[in-house]
Design a protein with these regions (language model features):
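C-terminal helical accessory/scaffold domains
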Residues: 461, 470-653
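Helicase-associated low-complexity/disordered flanking segments
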Residues: 1-54, 61-64, 269, 280-297, ...
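Conserved C-terminal RecA-like helicase domain
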Residues: 69, 91-120, 254, 259-326, ...
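Conserved helix/coil segment N-terminal to the catalytic DExD/H
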Residues: 121-155
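Conserved segment of the helicase C-terminal RecA-like domain
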Residues: 343, 358-403
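Conserved interdomain linker/interface between the two RecA-like ATPase lobes of SF2 helicase motors
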Residues: 179, 195-275, 301, 305
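A short beta-strand element within the Helicase C-terminal
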Residues: 326, 332-350, 384-389
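SF2 helicase catalytic motif II
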Residues: 138-139, 147-188
Length: 758
């Protein structure tokens, strides 16, 4: 393996060029930067940067790992990698849909046409014929497991953000993808943020070239402050933690775009409230755990996993291109979102551990380094600034710990052992993750599955893990999910939907024990039954943050009802899904959209629909209502309102509540009544809206918009894209693209009749 260390002393200017300074075989070298034409690329800039130049000069084929700071031009390196591996299809994979679509736009200019697999249902209907494909990790691993043609023709594979392998939830998928690349001999380029022990990662992927880059396109200046000392600069006397955070920022007096990383999400919301109430800032967020005051000052926002996805995307765009200059965030923003800033401010808590005799920090040291990676905007900032504000430890203790962190060994979540976690869809979360991890290779290689699994980094580091996997295979064989050495057709179906056999067992248990509940309370009964098929954690703390005691009380009532009716102990956060599915967020004026993971259930509902159609345990009328209730958060009897464009969660639930008030049996009856302008229904809708809107003017506007949307509705109801996707199960992809919504519904009703038995 050739190892290159790109040094900080490298220089780069977009117009003037610069130089690459690096160490190779213990010798320091200095070279001029390459021009795009020299490497066969037609690009709108004059020079490749030092990292790109060094990669092109030293990469001669095979696998490679690049470990470098954020925003150092790794995307272009993907194309340079392709130029030396032109045989076969070029595949780029990353963890998030936003990154996938960002790369789609970048690569389109080079390849002309680019295939996409981001989890969207319509994409699955399109056959991939393009030379290049961008895909999320999950879409790519599904293609690999099923031997999809576009994966089998891979000639070059780029795994971006490969450091996500350290994550408990998704790390196993990256290990699986790398094992397939190694097994099939697919040239692999792994792109990583700066991580400790990256050399171990390079050895694992059998890299011919490893570049460890210390160079940043925009130089970083780090400053560490003690919070107590910093607050002496301000005239006010802040008392609460959130007041201290905002006062510290005022003391720093930063200009330009600033990301403020906080160790706790509640502190983020509280700081936002202080900014709004006492500093006159205008809050960009719409879904909030407090009542916002209308202000006209500078914009401010908070970004974390609790914020609805649609709002997160708006906030990101406003920070990139708009007038939003101060954005509070938690550590989720440090990974997977391309959002550079002029400055980052990182609030860190430290404590001295008497057992290890060393300081512990939160957020952890690697996350702090990732957060620093957001500092500096190429072409806009001459320098990026990292301001670390610490409590509970001395400044030099943190500085020393950050240096030592980069010298530690590389670890993954699997190699260290998985933790049990409340809220998992199955009783045994660890078995569930491990079963899916091994069933992928079993699906692809049959009896040779061990050979691929032995290539997993975690198995190499922890050989006892292989023994655990062997025991799980034996158990799955006893349970009937593996016959001989082959997974059954049911097992293949489950794995293609990312559902473990253990989750399926839990589903069957609920199916048998909720018959009466599904008849009496269909929203509660069906959502509880299918909950094991949904991968999301559905954190109750997120819901409680926005709804306070109301959810705590309602959640307890839901759990008691479920346990009484089914005899099953509820510990998978089913109450969150049911609270959402009943439309309960409508009662909270501070909530514009369902928060957190509840705003990202579209892909989950599509996979759920595919699985339920293939299982054929319910007729399609039931399946359709269940998946739309999951997708849109509208009660079972009115859930098809979720397919009406322009309604969304709040308007859909306003209609559903009006329908319930007048005794409408379903959404079709309700829609017809609105179209016919039946006074009883229209008055009921106004009554429902009056609960949410105190302004008569706003109420009338919302009422008129809902009525206008409903009057344009055409029957039959249903999301055409989703229905075509589901119908493709029975008529094939090409035919599904040709048929209309009516025909798709006809196909589904003919084939999904609930005739199978378990």
């Amino acid at each position: 393996m050739k190892t290159v260390q790109l040094l900080e002393s490298s220089k780069f200017d977009l117009k003037k060029g610069g130089k690459a300074v690096y160490l190779i075989e213990g010798k320091e070298k200095e070279e001029e930067l390459l021009k795009p034409k020299e490497v066969g690329l037609n690009l709108p800039f004059k020079f490749l940067n030092p990292l790109q130049s060094v990669f092109f000069k030293h990469y001669e084929g095979g696998n490679a790992l690049i470990s470098s700071p954020t925003s150092s031009g790794k995307s272009l390196i993907s194309l340079l990698f392709y130029l030396k591996n032109k045989e076969g299809r070029f595949i780029y994979t990353a963890p998030t849909r936003s990154l996938i679509w960002e790369k789609f736009r970048e690569f389109k200019g080079f390849f002309g046409s680019v295939g996409v697999r981001s989890g969207d249902v319509v994409e699955e209907l399109q056959n991939i014929s393009q030379k290049a494909v961008v895909a999320t990790y999950e879409s790519l691993v599904a293609a690999a497991r099923n031997r999809s043609r576009w994966f089998e023709e891979a000639g070059a594979l780029v795994i971006d953000e490969v450091h996500v392998i350290r994550d408990e939830g998704r790390g196993a998928i990256i290990e699986e993808l790398v094992s397939y690349a190694l097994e099939e001999g697919i040239p692999l380029l792994a792109l990583s943020a700066t991580v400790p022990g990256a050399l171990s990662l390079a050895k694992w992927i059998e890299a011919e070239l490893f570049i460890d880059s210390r160079w940043r396109p925009v130089p970083l200046e780090r400053r560490i402050y003690n919070l107590r000392k910093l607050l002496k600069r301000v005239k006010s006397s802040p008392q609460t933690p959130q007041e201290k955070v905002v006062s510290a920022l005022e003391a720093l007096d930063l200009k330009g775009k600033t990301l403020v990383f906080l160790p706790r999400k509640d502190l983020g919301w509280q700081a936002l409230e202080v900014e709004n109430a006492f500093y006159g800032k205008k809050v960009v967020n719409e879904t909030l755990p407090f009542e916002v005051q209308p202000k006209k000052g500078e914009k401010v926002a908070f970004h974390n996993a609790d914020v609805p996805q649609e709002e997160r995307e708006k906030i990101e765009e406003e920070f990139r291109e708009g007038e939003l200059n101060r954005l509070y965030a938690t550590q989720t923003l440090a990974y997977g979102v391309n959002l550079p800033a002029d400055s980052v401010v990182i609030f860190v808590r430290g404590r001295f551990d008497r057992f290890s005799l060393e300081y512990k920090f939160f957020p952890d040291l690697l996350t702090i380094l990732q957060m620093e990676g957001r500092a500096g905007r190429l072409g806009l900032s001459e320098k990026g600034f990292s301001h670390i504000v610490i409590t509970g430890a001395k400044e030099d203790a943190l500085e020393e710990a950050l240096k030592e962190e980069m010298e530690s060994s590389f670890k993954t979540a699997l190699s260290q052992g998985l933790n049990s976690k409340e809220g998992a869809a199955c009783q045994n979360r660890k078995k569930s993750i491990l079963s899916l991890m091994l069933l992928g290779p079993v699906l692809r290689y049959g009896t040779s599955w061990k050979k691929a699994v032995k290539d997993f980094y975690s198995v190499r580091e922890n050989p006892l893990l292989l023994k655990e996997l062997e025991l799980i295979v034996e158990e799955l064989r006893e349970l009937g999910f593996i016959e001989g050495d082959k997974p059954t057709s049911l097992t293949k179906l489950l794995v293609s939907s990312f559902v473990s056999p253990y989750c399926f067992i839990e589903f069957l248990k609920r199916l048998k024990s909720t018959t009466s509940l599904r008849e009496k309370e269909p929203t509660i009964g069906y959502l509880f039954t299918v909950r094991p098929f949904l991968r999301k954690e559905l954190n109750p703390k997120t819901v409680a943050l926005f709804t306070k005691e109301a959810f705590t009380q309602e959640g307890e009532r839901i759990r008691e009802l479920l346990e009484e009716e089914s005899g099953i102990e509820v510990n998978d956060n089913s109450e969150v899904l049911i609270f959402y599915g009943k439309g309960s967020f409508f009662d909270f004026k501070n909530v514009a959209r369902p928060p957190g993971e509840l705003s990202t259930l579209s892909t989950e509902s599509s996979l759920l629909g595919q699985l339920l159609c293939k299982l054929n345990l319910f007729d399609f009328e039931v399946v359709h209502r269940v998946i739309m209730s999951v997708r849109g958060g509208i009660p079972f009897n009115f859930s098809l309102l979720a397919s009406v464009e322009g309604l969304g969660y709040m308007r859909g639930n306003a209609l559903a509540r009006a329908g319930k008030l007048v005794g409408a049996p379903n959404e079709t009856s309700l829609i017809n009544a609105v179209k016919e302008e039946k006074e009883e229904v229209l008055e009921a809708l106004k009554e429902v809206l009056a609960f949410r809107y105190s302004s008569l003017k706003v109420l009338e506007k919302e009422f008129n918009q809902i009525v206008n949307i409903v009057k344009k509705v055409k029957f039959p109801l249903g999301n055409e894209r989703l229905l075509k996707f589901l119908s493709s199960i029975f008529v094939g992809r090409e035919e599904a693209l040709k048929i209309d919504k009516e025909k798709a519904l006809e196909v589904l009703r003919e084939n999904v009749k609930g005739e199978e038995e378990v």
